[in-house]
Amino acid sequence: MHVIAVDAMGGDNAPQAIVEGVNQALAEFKDIEIQLYGDEAKIKNYLTANERVSIVHTDEKINSDDEPVKAIRKKKKASMVLGAQAVKEKAADAVISAGNTGALLAAGLFVVGRIKGVERPGLMSTMPSFTGQPFDMLDLGANAENTANHLHQYAILGSFYAKNVRGIATPRVGLLNNGTEKTKGDSLRKEAFELLSKEASINFIGNVEAREIMSGAADVVVADGFTGNAVLKAIEGTGLGTMKTLKSAIMNGGLKAKLGAFLLKDRLKGMKETMDYSSAGGAVLFGLKAPVVKCHGSSDAKAVYYTIKQVRKMLDTKVVEQLVDAFDPKEEVN
């Protein structure tokens, strides 16, 4: 039985969306137990009774505008912190939150702890693509500044996840750069390219450009945290803007536009589903001693359900235990 700690109070739509997503997951997966951390009265308004769910009451929560590290240190009873603490104490196997990203990263690093040998855990998400085959990308903002060694390690981490969780036998790893030639990029990218070219444990295919990553250029895309976060936000904004513009054109285009949309409704639905990030789950702070996963702040119940599904897969495949052994065979997860 997998025990998953869930911060019920984090995110724009908490606790309703969080709890409803938990209800769906409990109905679907019989091998999980959920610990919900937060305001018990508010949680019960949406919770379906189930013997595999428990509530740990707390009135304290971390707000979106709280300074991350300070919040973790001062708000010891916050729902997010208690969930991370449960993982540290082995009362839970993983923790999920849709709350303050920086605070969850801090809780992951300072409470759950990183695997020995991992210099900088990276924030990694499985992203949709136009081909229908998702790709993993990291770092998406856990670290604003990185060295070439960090990028080298991100490539190993991302390849490991793609292979062991997503089932890709030989993941193609690409380095995000401003051109595909090996001479492209600044000193960071050039140094990272040399390191990745010599790394025998991964299938490094060279540099990839931002315009290529949504078209299946690589299974794993490696970037420094600042660049990765900027690209992520650009992809999200472009997707939302495209759908909004398309909807506006249909609604304001008269009868012909509406008729065309009706005839294309199945195609349009398929397009929307292809670009739906929620079905891929949350962003994993990969390189820690247990799964710490961030849902999007605006997550609905569907996104929460898929994040729990993702964490369940991580626990089923024992990817963290395998990662510990890969980086330091003598260390045990604690």
From Swiss-Prot:
Gene3D superfamilies: Isopropylmalate Dehydrogenase. Pathway: Lipid metabolism; phospholipid metabolism. Keywords: Cytoplasm, Lipid biosynthesis, Lipid metabolism, Phospholipid biosynthesis, Phospholipid metabolism, Transferase. Pfam families: FA_synthesis. Belongs to the PlsX family. Catalyzes the reversible formation of acyl-phosphate (acyl-PO(4)) from acyl-[acyl-carrier-protein] (acyl-ACP). This enzyme utilizes acyl-ACP as fatty acyl donor, but not acyl-CoA. It is found in: Cytoplasm. This is Phosphate acyltransferase. Its EC number is 2.3.1.274. Homodimer. Probably interacts with PlsY. The gene is plsX. GO terms for biological process: fatty acid biosynthetic process; phospholipid biosynthetic process. GO terms for molecular function: phosphate:acyl-[acyl carrier protein] acyltransferase activity. InterPro entries: FA_synthesis (IPR003664), Phospholipid_synth_PlsX-like (IPR012281). One of its GO terms (cellular component) is cytoplasm. It comes from Streptococcus thermophilus (strain ATCC BAA-491 / LMD-9).
